[in-house]
């Protein structure tokens, strides 16, 4: 008879069925005059500042997020990139499975903040403030870091004619570990484990394998976040690409928008309702790679399946040979690998036109 005792397993069902106690009362009602169409944020003015002429315009903005967007230090992932914060102060309040992310905003006397949602912004100097804020924010990401934004496909912020403030994001920032073939020494480098001794003896950070194609895919995804943030700000209607929350197929959206009359391979965004003079065909993105962006964005639904999504945008098809020149098959059609290269080149040309229109330098995008 074996004398080894079996380990005791806890009843996981009890934890699943448990209703957590929330030490903080949920704020009611959830009303936000900056975001009237949202149900997860609230803005209020501190009453004790009404007698202070310097702070009478202070605003407290709170966003309710899910606790899954906390990192190993119980800090929201999006705050990892806040190096030069335009908000006066931020406070994270944990409430069981909810996170209340609060911001103190201190406007100057003539400053008025607006959301990018259906803003219809047409002032080019203000748009450059928005663009600069987005570039500086996502520019803090390291080469082996991967940002994935849930619920929307743009960087959420509020802005005025003087500055832009990054709002709380439902986002992951996943650390990558260079693959063996990518490391200079030919050996796997352990850059992932950031825990200190002795805690790293118990557990380690969960990293994905970082490859050339995964890093390229992530970089291109970031450029789409920039483009879509600007599109959201200049539209006076709902962004047609805001389909993640509604769980609508991107193929249906692209088909409903139609093809741009100037280029049949691009999505027709030239006839949308803009706040100012329509920008022509500058905002009409390439169709095929736009679909890839939204397939790539599904990664946020299951971050552990990085092998399926991390290289999706820049991944070369295995169809066809390995020649660098464009090849044609018996039907006079390009091989799938060459087509994917052309899609990437088309996106690069599109972002070049985008940068020229908004007066950006190529190295900033």
Swiss-Prot record:
Keywords: Virion. It is found in: Virion. It comes from the Viruses. The keyword ATP-binding does not apply. GO terms for cellular component: virion component. InterPro entries: Baculo_VP1054. The keyword Nucleotidyltransferase does not apply. Pfam families: Baculo_VP1054. Signal peptide: none annotated. Structural protein that participates in nucleocapsid assembly. Plays an essential role in the proper localization of the major capsid protein VP39, and the minor capsid protein 38K into the capsid assembly site. Interacts with C42 and VP80. Interacts with protein 38K. This is Protein AC54. It comes from Autographa californica nuclear polyhedrosis virus (AcMNPV).
């Amino acid at each position: 008879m074996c004398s080894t005792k079996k380990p005791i397993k806890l009843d996981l069902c009890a934890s699943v069925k448990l209703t957590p106690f929330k030490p903080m009362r949920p704020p009611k009602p959830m009303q936000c005059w900056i975001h009237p169409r949202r149900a997860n944020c609230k803005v209020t003015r501190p009453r004790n500042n009404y007698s202070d002429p310097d702070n009478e315009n202070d605003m407290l903005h709170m966003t309710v997020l899910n606790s899954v967007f906390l990192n190993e230090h119980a800090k929201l992932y999006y705050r990892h990139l806040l190096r030069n914060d335009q908000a006066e102060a931020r406070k994270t309040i944990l409430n069981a499975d909810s996170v209340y992310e609060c911001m103190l905003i201190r406007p100057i006397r003539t400053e008025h903040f607006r959301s990018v949602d259906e803003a219809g912004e047409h002032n080019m100097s203000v748009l450059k403030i928005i663009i600069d804020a987005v570039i500086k924010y996502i520019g803090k990401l390291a080469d082996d870091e991967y940002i994935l934004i849930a619920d929307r496909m743009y960087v959420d912020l509020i802005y005025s004619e003087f500055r832009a403030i990054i709002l709380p994001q439902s986002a992951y920032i996943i650390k990558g570990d260079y693959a063996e073939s990518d490391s200079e020494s030919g050996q796997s480098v352990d850059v992932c484990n950031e825990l200190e001794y002795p805690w790293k003896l118990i557990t380690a950070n969960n990293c994905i394998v970082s490859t050339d194609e995964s890093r390229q895919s992530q970089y291109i995804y970031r450029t789409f976040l920039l483009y879509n943030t600007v599109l959201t700000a200049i539209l006076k209607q709902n962004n047609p690409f805001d389909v993640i929350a509604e769980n609508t197929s991107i193929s249906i959206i692209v088909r409903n928008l139609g093809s741009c009359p100037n280029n049949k391979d691009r999505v027709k965004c030239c006839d949308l309702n803009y706040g100012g003079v329509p920008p022509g065909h500058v905002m009409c993105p390439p169709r095929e790679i736009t679909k890839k962006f939204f397939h790539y964005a599904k990664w946020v639904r299951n971050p552990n399946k990085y092998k399926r999504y991390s290289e999706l945008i820049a991944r070369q098809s295995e169809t066809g040979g390995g020649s660098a020149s464009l090849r044609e098959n018996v039907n006079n059609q390009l091989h799938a690998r060459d087509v994917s290269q052309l899609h990437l080149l088309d996106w690069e040309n599109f972002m070049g036109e985008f940068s020229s229109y908004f007066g950006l330098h190529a190295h900033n995008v």
